[in-house]
Amino acid sequence: MVGLSLPFFKRKEEKISAVTVKEEEVAVDPLPENVEVLDEYWIHEKYARVVIGKSPDSGNIVYYVDEVKLNADERAAYLKISDIIARELNPAEIGKDGDARRGLLREASRLSLKYQRAFKTVTRAGWDKINYYLERDLLGFGPLNVIIGDYRVEDVSCDGVNVPIFVWHRRYESIPTNIRFLDKDALDDYIVKLAHKSGKHVSSAFPIVDAMLFGKHRLTASFREEVSPKGSTFTIRKFREEPFSIVDLVQMGTISDEMAAYFWMLIENRCTIMVIGGTGSGKTTILNALASLIKPGMKLVTVEETAELNLPHENWVQFVSRESYGLTGTKVGQISLFDLVKTSLRYRPDYLIVGEVRGEEAYVLFQAMATGHGGLSTLHAENIEYAIRRLVSPPMNVSETYIPLINAVILIERVTLPQPRMGMSIGRRARMVWEVEDFEKYVN
């Protein structure tokens, strides 16, 4: 047995997963010279800016990403150094902690000094550009990093190969960008790397992934043609690092002073509130702001599919559901919202918060409210009639006698607002608040 090599018993070394693609795999259309500029701002000073303008060809509004370019020598140096960092730097040193950027730039600086002779034509400004791209691809989101870094963008979506990346802009709503993937394999690899960075798995056997990226952005993706005939797709729902407080919502006009005082009074008395609305209407934002009104000394338990809530409380237990990766169809190891809501009752919470109810967990939530626990949750519905109809129908199956346990329902909608000077903007408004007296008996 001497000299026998068994490489399959060796532990595979972990490598840095750079979110980078080759130039021929992604297209970034240049900014047209005669574009009609509607808005312009920097995301990374000197290196990356956003220009929103009307395309001279189609006349449509386009979100242009304009990044500093690397010349041939700078590109060669970048590829050399990024390859060395990806192979040699310990992932623990370049992870999600606050020292990641510092560690990366320190290593990049060391390697740039080492290879200065090999790349004599690269100037100091050129090395600064290289460091920008290293940080973009090793710590950020690669070609989409500028878009993700734009706080004005709420959603980023890719519908497939040779289709522009679309963004949902706070002022201009859904508009295409000048970026698109040209290669199926490159798009597949990009999704795999995003999933890897979020600690999730995606493959042909498990082609749907729902994960939380660093920065608390929510990733939903489909892999290859398993469930999406056009190939891989993804959408990234962005969230603020500092969530809106109830005061912020009042100042923005989302809710009125009277509404804020009313909700505060309800929460002080451990009442139950349900937030309803359509997709992207701001239900989670309202839910987070309401939960921040709960007394600091109370015990909170939150149950979510992905960790979106961000609360200031110390006495807070956060539960997140887990999908099964079994191949037998038995869902071995899956932990559902229903399981977590049942478990949360053993923690004796003062307030139980469910990110969104849509299944059998609703029944357990109402059981908890019946025993004196405060409750907060969201539900997809356009009005209170549809909301109650969903609650009493399968798969929620909440008894009609439990409906009065909901003290108040708030409807949040996305609306179009006039600008002070010209044009329109998009905002969120609480359109209606109901008190629930009984089944099918509501007061607004």
Specify the residue positions occupied by each region the protein language model found.
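Active-site phosphate-binding and catalytic loops of NTP-dependent enzymes
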Residues: 139-150, 195-210, 298, 396-399, ...
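Conserved lysine of the Walker
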Residues: 283
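Switch/coupling sub-region of P-loop NTPases
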Residues: 262-279, 289-415
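Conserved P-loop NTPase
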Residues: 408-444
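P-loop NTP-binding catalytic core
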Residues: 158-272, 314
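N-terminal accessory targeting/assembly segments
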Residues: 1-198, 214
